[in-house]
């Protein structure tokens, strides 16, 4: 009979951050006796989950995708935002093969370069600095017609905050002497992701036909008129900005188009309108024969067009490494975070590794999770305890969604109830691990529920930039190093399992043997 395995578990408490202050801190103020016990009696430190520590620009809050990628990879995974910003700073962006080639083709045709994208400092789907850098590159490579088609934000930025971005862009293009902001439209239309093709068509027809319900002399005038109509940035209707003629800046045969969003999900639909011959979302009245259409990053493996920043492959994540060592592993979460403990934790790979099993627990069917703050945590725990006691798994990775998903609701009392539910679940898990001689690390991918009200007294619904806890439960006599990062967790797990880390993992183990 095969000997039962003593599991090492990683428990990821999504959105469970640390903050000194107790005001509006749903975690600190909740009744969590087990958490209080392990926080004071077990090895316990704080680790970093935002900014450069996870491959994001300094000061940028972390998120679940980035967090799980770093947790599983065992190295800092530089995000597209950071890769592109770094290339611009280092002068490498100007030589990017896809971007420079597209611009050169348009210039040799005597045609225009069109830059599409979310013109915003939000940093979630795009950054206006990238768009401005592309304007400069186009001019340096000889383009004398550079048109920015500005999609307006208002979701990752305040609802009416687009004016400085439009002014900054028009000012630069005027200085370069090569173009203007040629159209504006809210992201509600240009960046749909739910196959609402009527919205996307409004953007496509604006770009390719110059069809728009509104025209204006300048981008700022267009925005002012939209505000007067009661439209916030996100919902600004298609507006064409006049030049030498109404249609001098529509996308035409021989032009180059560069889509400057780095996040894929809301860039796919509009991209498909331009590049798919068998597109069937709506009837295209014009399909320009472009010199090139460039995606800033790969929006989908199924979209076949030039890409400036292809995905970098992550090899030897902890999941892949476990498989090469013929170890067994389990990934478990409820629906809301299932992709995070599977696809993202595996370095962007969907397929199961050899020896890997997965358990998906459905998330509750409620409008918002403050209505059921425990979500499916008790059911996740039932399956997790069963897996621990089964003796089947060397490594178990589990996500609890409550701190993040209930935190996003902005409802303080519900977030406290979520924390109290997690506390009860952790006690059950610790008892099961103790019973079989197992061990675990408890941490989070980023904070959220530790701050439920912002400095203006409004509900605080987004992630935080503060640290998160790291706690060890198990039989080993160890301490934990301070100042760790998410990328140090995989090496720490391997250390606890008495396994060497692969050379690809540049994170450091935080385990100190006493």
From Swiss-Prot:
Protein name listed in UniProt: 2,3-bisphosphoglycerate-independent phosphoglycerate mutase
The species this protein was found in: Hahella chejuensis (strain KCTC 2396)
Names of required cofactors: Mn(2+)
Assembly information from the UniProt record: Monomer.
Keywords: Glycolysis, Isomerase, Manganese, Metal-binding
Enzyme class: isomerase
PANTHER family (UniProt xref): 2,3-BISPHOSPHOGLYCERATE-INDEPENDENT PHOSPHOGLYCERATE MUTASE
Binding-site positions, Mn(2+) 1: 404, 408, 463
InterPro entries assigned: Alkaline_phosphatase_core_sf, BPG-indep_PGM_N, Metalloenzyme, PGAM_B_sf, Pgm_bpd_ind
């Amino acid at each position: 009979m095969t000997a039962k395995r003593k599991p090492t578990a990683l428990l990821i408490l999504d959105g469970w951050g640390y903050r000194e202050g107790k005001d509006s801190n749903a975690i600190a103020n909740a009744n969590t006796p087990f958490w209080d016990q392990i926080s004071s009696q077990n090895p316990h430190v704080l680790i970093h989950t935002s900014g450069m520590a996870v491959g994001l620009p300094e000061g940028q809050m972390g998120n679940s995708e980035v967090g799980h990628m770093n947790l599983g990879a065992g190295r800092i995974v530089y995000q597209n935002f950071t890769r592109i910003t770094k290339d611009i700073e280092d002068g490498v962006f100007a030589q990017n093969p896809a971007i420079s080639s597209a611009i050169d083709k348009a210039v040799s045709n005597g045609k225009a370069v069109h830059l599409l994208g979310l013109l915003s400092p939000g940093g979630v789907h795009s950054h206006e600095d990238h768009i401005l850098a592309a304007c400069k590159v186009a001019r340096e490579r000889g383009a004398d017609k550079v048109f920015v088609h500005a999609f307006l934000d208002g979701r990752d930025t305040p609802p009416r905050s687009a004016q400085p971005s439009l002014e900054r862009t028009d000012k630069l293009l005027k200085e370069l002497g090569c173009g203007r902001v040629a159209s504006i439209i809210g992201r509600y239309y240009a960046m749909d992701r739910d196959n609402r093709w009527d919205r996307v068509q409004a953007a496509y027809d604006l770009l390719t036909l110059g069809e728009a319900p509104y025209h204006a002399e300048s981008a700022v005038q267009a925005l002012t008129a939209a505000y007067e109509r009661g439209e916030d940035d996100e919902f600004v209707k298609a507006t064409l900005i006049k030049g030498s003629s109404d249609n001098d800046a529509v996308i035409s045969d021989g032009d180059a188009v560069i889509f400057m969003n780095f996040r894929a999900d809301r860039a796919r639909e509009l991209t498909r309108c331009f590049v798919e011959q068998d597109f069937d979302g709506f009837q295209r009245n014009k399909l320009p024969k472009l010199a090139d259409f460039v995606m800033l990053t790969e929006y989908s493996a199924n979209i076949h067009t030039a890409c400036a920043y292809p995905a970098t492959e992550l090899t030897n994540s902890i999941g892949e490494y476990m498989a090469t060592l013929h170890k067994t592993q389990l990934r478990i979460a409820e629906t809301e975070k299932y992709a995070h403990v599977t696809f993202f934790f595996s370095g962007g790979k969907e397929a199961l590794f050899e020896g890997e099993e997965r358990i998906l627990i459905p998330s509750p069917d409620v409008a918002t999770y403050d209505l059921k703050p425990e979500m499916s945590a008790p059911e996740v725990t039932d399956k997790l305890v069963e897996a621990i006691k089964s003796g089947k798994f060397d490594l178990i990775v589990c996500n609890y969604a409550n701190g993040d998903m209930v935190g996003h609701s902005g409802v303080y009392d519900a977030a406290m109830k979520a924390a109290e539910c997690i506390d009860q679940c952790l006690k059950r898990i610790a008892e099961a691990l103790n019973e079989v001689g197992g061990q675990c690390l408890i941490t989070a991918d980023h904070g959220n529920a530790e701050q439920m009200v912002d400095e203006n007294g409004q509900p605080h619904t987004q992630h935080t930039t503060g640290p998160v806890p790291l706690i060890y439960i198990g039989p080993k006599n160890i301490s934990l190093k301070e100042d760790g990062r998410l990328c140090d967790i995989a090496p720490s797990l391997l250390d606890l399992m008495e396994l060497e880390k692969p050379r690809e993992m540049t994170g450091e183990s935080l385990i100190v043997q006493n």
